[in-house]
Amino acid sequence: MRVALKLAYIGTEFHGSQIQPNVETVEKELFKALRNLSIIESPKSADYTCAGRTDAGVHALGQVVAFDTEKPNLAIPRVINSELPPAIWAWAHAEVPYYFDARRSAVSRHYHYVMSGEDYDISKMREASKLLLGTHDFENFSRSNGEKSTVRTLERINVRVDGEITKIDVVGNSFLWNMVRKIVTALSMIGNGVRDNDWLLQMLNPEIYEEGIEPAPPYGLTLMGVNYGENIEWIEDDYSIRRAGEQNHKRILRHRVMAEVLEELISHE
Protein backbone atom coordinates (compact mmCIF):
# COMPACT_ATOMS: atom_id res chain seq x y z
CA MET A 1 0.00 0.00 0.00
CA ARG A 2 1.11 3.56 -0.66
CA VAL A 3 0.62 5.99 2.21
CA ALA A 4 0.88 9.78 2.38
CA LEU A 5 1.49 11.74 5.58
CA LYS A 6 1.02 15.36 6.52
CA LEU A 7 3.91 16.58 8.65
CA ALA A 8 4.49 19.67 10.73
CA TYR A 9 7.84 20.74 12.13
CA ILE A 10 9.65 23.61 13.80
CA GLY A 11 12.36 24.42 11.28
CA THR A 12 14.68 26.27 13.64
CA GLU A 13 15.45 22.91 15.26
CA PHE A 14 16.89 21.46 12.04
CA HIS A 15 19.36 22.08 9.22
CA GLY A 16 16.57 21.86 6.66
CA SER A 17 14.16 19.10 5.71
CA GLN A 18 16.30 17.12 3.26
CA ILE A 19 18.64 14.50 4.67
CA GLN A 20 22.29 15.55 4.84
CA PRO A 21 25.34 13.90 6.39
CA ASN A 22 26.43 14.85 9.91
CA VAL A 23 23.61 17.32 10.67
CA GLU A 24 20.12 17.06 12.13
CA THR A 25 17.39 17.25 9.47
CA VAL A 26 13.69 16.47 9.36
CA GLU A 27 14.14 13.54 6.98
CA LYS A 28 16.92 12.05 9.11
CA GLU A 29 14.53 11.84 12.05
CA LEU A 30 11.60 10.69 9.89
CA PHE A 31 13.57 7.91 8.19
CA LYS A 32 14.90 6.73 11.55
CA ALA A 33 11.37 6.59 12.95
CA LEU A 34 9.97 4.72 9.94
CA ARG A 35 12.81 2.18 10.04
CA ASN A 36 12.57 1.68 13.81
CA LEU A 37 8.89 0.86 13.39
CA SER A 38 9.63 -1.43 10.39
CA ILE A 39 7.30 0.67 8.24
CA ILE A 40 9.98 0.95 5.55
CA GLU A 41 13.38 -0.65 5.01
CA SER A 42 14.83 2.33 3.18
CA PRO A 43 13.55 5.48 1.44
CA LYS A 44 14.64 4.10 -1.94
CA SER A 45 12.93 0.73 -1.62
CA ALA A 46 9.78 2.47 -0.36
CA ASP A 47 9.78 4.91 -3.31
CA TYR A 48 9.75 7.79 -0.82
CA THR A 49 8.85 11.25 -2.15
CA CYS A 50 8.48 14.64 -0.47
CA ALA A 51 6.39 17.63 -1.59
CA GLY A 52 9.24 20.10 -1.30
CA ARG A 53 12.54 20.79 0.37
CA THR A 54 12.57 23.46 3.06
CA ASP A 55 15.76 25.27 4.05
CA ALA A 56 17.31 25.41 7.50
CA GLY A 57 15.05 27.42 9.80
CA VAL A 58 11.93 27.15 7.62
CA HIS A 59 8.89 25.56 9.27
CA ALA A 60 6.03 23.44 7.95
CA LEU A 61 2.44 22.81 8.86
CA GLY A 62 1.41 20.84 5.76
CA GLN A 63 4.52 19.15 4.38
CA VAL A 64 3.53 15.96 2.53
CA VAL A 65 5.54 12.77 2.14
CA ALA A 66 4.57 9.46 0.55
CA PHE A 67 5.99 5.94 0.63
CA ASP A 68 5.13 2.29 0.03
CA THR A 69 4.71 0.05 3.04
CA GLU A 70 3.63 -3.48 3.87
CA LYS A 71 2.52 -2.32 7.33
CA PRO A 72 -0.09 0.40 6.71
CA ASN A 73 -1.60 -0.25 10.15
CA LEU A 74 1.59 1.23 11.65
CA ALA A 75 1.87 4.11 9.17
CA ILE A 76 -0.42 6.39 11.15
CA PRO A 77 0.48 9.62 12.96
CA ARG A 78 0.20 8.57 16.60
CA VAL A 79 2.42 5.51 16.03
CA ILE A 80 5.03 7.38 13.98
CA ASN A 81 5.08 10.29 16.44
CA SER A 82 6.13 7.90 19.20
CA GLU A 83 9.53 7.71 17.46
CA LEU A 84 9.82 11.37 16.45
CA PRO A 85 11.28 14.27 18.45
CA PRO A 86 8.75 16.86 19.72
CA ALA A 87 9.73 19.36 17.00
CA ILE A 88 8.29 17.05 14.29
CA TRP A 89 4.83 15.52 14.24
CA ALA A 90 2.59 13.76 11.74
CA TRP A 91 -1.06 14.76 12.03
CA ALA A 92 -2.88 13.19 9.06
CA HIS A 93 -2.51 10.22 6.74
CA ALA A 94 -4.16 8.88 3.60
CA GLU A 95 -4.05 5.90 1.30
CA VAL A 96 -2.97 7.15 -2.13
CA PRO A 97 -2.62 5.55 -5.60
CA TYR A 98 0.58 3.65 -6.39
CA TYR A 99 1.61 6.39 -8.84
CA PHE A 100 1.24 9.25 -6.32
CA ASP A 101 4.36 11.41 -6.09
CA ALA A 102 4.31 13.97 -3.27
CA ARG A 103 6.30 16.45 -5.36
CA ARG A 104 5.29 15.84 -8.97
CA SER A 105 1.59 15.30 -8.24
CA ALA A 106 1.30 18.66 -6.48
CA VAL A 107 -0.82 21.33 -8.18
CA SER A 108 0.09 24.22 -5.89
CA ARG A 109 1.87 25.09 -2.66
CA HIS A 110 0.99 27.66 -0.02
CA TYR A 111 3.66 29.54 1.95
CA HIS A 112 3.08 31.95 4.81
CA TYR A 113 5.59 34.56 6.00
CA VAL A 114 5.45 36.44 9.31
CA MET A 115 7.57 39.51 10.09
CA SER A 116 7.58 42.43 12.47
CA GLY A 117 5.29 45.23 11.27
CA GLU A 118 7.68 48.19 11.23
CA ASP A 119 6.30 51.15 9.28
CA TYR A 120 5.50 49.48 5.98
CA ASP A 121 3.14 51.11 3.52
CA ILE A 122 0.85 48.10 3.19
CA SER A 123 -1.11 49.60 0.28
CA LYS A 124 2.12 49.87 -1.74
CA MET A 125 3.03 46.29 -0.89
CA ARG A 126 -0.39 45.08 -2.01
CA GLU A 127 -0.19 46.98 -5.29
CA ALA A 128 3.29 45.61 -5.93
CA SER A 129 2.19 42.06 -5.17
CA LYS A 130 -0.31 42.22 -8.05
CA LEU A 131 2.61 42.62 -10.47
CA LEU A 132 3.99 39.27 -9.36
CA LEU A 133 0.80 37.33 -10.11
CA GLY A 134 0.68 35.13 -13.17
CA THR A 135 3.55 33.51 -15.04
CA HIS A 136 6.97 35.19 -14.92
CA ASP A 137 10.67 34.43 -15.03
CA PHE A 138 11.69 34.59 -11.37
CA GLU A 139 15.43 34.15 -11.93
CA ASN A 140 16.17 37.35 -9.97
CA PHE A 141 14.17 35.92 -7.07
CA SER A 142 16.05 32.66 -6.78
CA ARG A 143 19.33 31.15 -5.74
CA SER A 144 20.86 29.05 -8.50
CA ASN A 145 20.18 25.38 -7.91
CA GLY A 146 20.55 23.89 -11.38
CA GLU A 147 16.91 24.49 -12.30
CA LYS A 148 16.17 23.94 -15.99
CA SER A 149 13.62 26.75 -15.98
CA THR A 150 13.10 29.69 -13.64
CA VAL A 151 9.60 30.39 -14.96
CA ARG A 152 6.92 29.94 -12.32
CA THR A 153 3.24 30.86 -11.88
CA LEU A 154 1.90 32.64 -8.80
CA GLU A 155 -1.84 32.30 -8.16
CA ARG A 156 -2.27 34.47 -5.09
CA ILE A 157 -0.37 36.88 -2.84
CA ASN A 158 -2.03 38.39 0.20
CA VAL A 159 -0.44 41.03 2.44
CA ARG A 160 -2.12 41.93 5.72
CA VAL A 161 -1.36 43.47 9.10
CA ASP A 162 -2.17 41.75 12.38
CA GLY A 163 -1.27 44.07 15.24
CA GLU A 164 2.48 44.63 15.13
CA ILE A 165 2.95 41.76 12.70
CA THR A 166 2.87 41.80 8.89
CA LYS A 167 1.80 38.53 7.23
CA ILE A 168 2.30 37.55 3.61
CA ASP A 169 0.70 34.51 1.95
CA VAL A 170 2.00 33.24 -1.38
CA VAL A 171 0.41 30.47 -3.46
CA GLY A 172 1.96 29.12 -6.64
CA ASN A 173 2.43 26.00 -8.72
CA SER A 174 6.01 25.52 -7.52
CA PHE A 175 8.84 27.62 -6.16
CA LEU A 176 12.53 28.15 -6.79
CA TRP A 177 15.15 27.98 -4.06
CA ASN A 178 14.74 31.05 -1.79
CA MET A 179 12.01 32.42 -4.09
CA VAL A 180 9.38 33.15 -1.43
CA ARG A 181 11.88 34.74 0.93
CA LYS A 182 13.23 36.98 -1.85
CA ILE A 183 9.70 38.00 -2.80
CA VAL A 184 9.20 39.00 0.84
CA THR A 185 12.39 41.07 0.69
CA ALA A 186 11.25 42.81 -2.50
CA LEU A 187 7.82 43.65 -1.09
CA SER A 188 9.42 44.90 2.14
CA MET A 189 11.74 47.19 0.19
CA ILE A 190 8.76 48.65 -1.65
CA GLY A 191 6.80 48.90 1.59
CA ASN A 192 9.48 51.01 3.26
CA GLY A 193 10.09 53.18 0.19
CA VAL A 194 13.53 51.87 -0.76
CA ARG A 195 12.26 50.56 -4.12
CA ASP A 196 9.21 51.07 -6.34
CA ASN A 197 7.04 49.17 -8.82
CA ASP A 198 9.20 50.11 -11.81
CA TRP A 199 12.11 48.34 -10.14
CA LEU A 200 9.93 45.29 -9.46
CA LEU A 201 8.96 45.09 -13.13
CA GLN A 202 12.64 45.21 -14.03
CA MET A 203 13.29 42.35 -11.63
CA LEU A 204 10.75 40.27 -13.56
CA ASN A 205 12.78 40.74 -16.75
CA PRO A 206 16.07 38.96 -15.94
CA GLU A 207 17.22 38.82 -19.57
CA ILE A 208 17.63 42.60 -19.46
CA TYR A 209 18.04 43.38 -15.77
CA GLU A 210 19.96 41.39 -13.16
CA GLU A 211 20.13 42.11 -9.45
CA GLY A 212 20.71 39.91 -6.46
CA ILE A 213 18.68 40.56 -3.32
CA GLU A 214 19.00 38.93 0.07
CA PRO A 215 16.29 36.48 1.11
CA ALA A 216 14.26 37.36 4.19
CA PRO A 217 15.22 35.37 7.32
CA PRO A 218 14.11 31.73 7.18
CA TYR A 219 12.51 31.62 10.63
CA GLY A 220 9.50 33.67 9.43
CA LEU A 221 8.53 31.21 6.68
CA THR A 222 6.13 28.26 6.92
CA LEU A 223 5.01 25.77 4.28
CA MET A 224 1.30 25.80 5.09
CA GLY A 225 0.04 23.17 2.70
CA VAL A 226 0.17 21.40 -0.64
CA ASN A 227 -2.79 21.05 -2.99
CA TYR A 228 -3.07 17.97 -5.20
CA GLY A 229 -6.25 18.82 -7.05
CA GLU A 230 -7.69 15.37 -6.46
CA ASN A 231 -9.83 13.76 -3.83
CA ILE A 232 -7.32 12.53 -1.27
CA GLU A 233 -9.22 11.35 1.79
CA TRP A 234 -7.03 12.61 4.59
CA ILE A 235 -7.68 11.14 8.01
CA GLU A 236 -6.70 13.60 10.72
CA ASP A 237 -5.42 12.26 14.03
CA ASP A 238 -7.10 14.31 16.76
CA TYR A 239 -4.86 12.87 19.46
CA SER A 240 -1.67 13.84 17.60
CA ILE A 241 -2.99 17.32 16.89
CA ARG A 242 -3.99 17.85 20.53
CA ARG A 243 -0.68 16.52 21.86
CA ALA A 244 1.32 18.76 19.50
CA GLY A 245 -0.74 21.72 20.66
CA GLU A 246 0.02 20.98 24.30
CA GLN A 247 3.75 20.58 23.65
CA ASN A 248 3.98 23.75 21.63
CA HIS A 249 2.00 25.77 24.14
CA LYS A 250 4.83 25.06 26.57
CA ARG A 251 7.29 26.23 23.92
CA ILE A 252 5.31 29.46 23.47
CA LEU A 253 5.42 30.13 27.21
CA ARG A 254 9.20 29.62 27.24
CA HIS A 255 9.62 32.09 24.38
CA ARG A 256 7.43 34.65 26.17
CA VAL A 257 9.55 34.33 29.29
CA MET A 258 12.74 34.67 27.24
CA ALA A 259 11.37 37.77 25.49
CA GLU A 260 10.62 39.34 28.87
CA VAL A 261 14.13 38.49 30.11
CA LEU A 262 15.68 40.13 27.03
CA GLU A 263 13.54 43.24 27.51
CA GLU A 264 14.79 43.52 31.07
CA LEU A 265 18.40 42.99 30.02
CA ILE A 266 18.39 45.77 27.43
CA SER A 267 16.39 48.19 29.58
CA HIS A 268 18.45 47.72 32.74
CA GLU A 269 19.96 50.89 34.13
Curated annotation (Swiss-Prot):
SUPFAM superfamilies in the cross-refs: Pseudouridine synthase (SSF55120)
Class of this enzyme: isomerase
InterPro entries tied to this protein: PsdUridine_synth_cat_dom_sf, PsdUridine_synth_TruA, PsdUridine_synth_TruA_a/b_dom, PsdUridine_synth_TruA_C, TruA/RsuA/RluB/E/F_N
List of residues binding substrate: Y111
GO MF entries: pseudouridine synthase activity; RNA binding; tRNA pseudouridine(38-40) synthase activity
UniProt EC number: 5.4.99.12
Keywords from the UniProt entry: Isomerase, tRNA processing
Protein name: tRNA pseudouridine synthase A
Family annotation (Gene3D superfamilies): Pseudouridine synthase I, catalytic domain, C-terminal subdomain, Pseudouridine synthase I, catalytic domain, N-terminal subdomain
Signal peptide positions (record): none
Superkingdom of origin organism: Archaea
Gene Ontology biological process terms, A to Z: tRNA pseudouridine synthesis
Lineage of the species this protein comes from: Archaea, Methanobacteriati, Methanobacteriota, Stenosarchaea group, Methanomicrobia
Organism: Methanosarcina acetivorans (strain ATCC 35395 / DSM 2834 / JCM 12185 / C2A)
Family, as annotated: Belongs to the tRNA pseudouridine synthase TruA family.
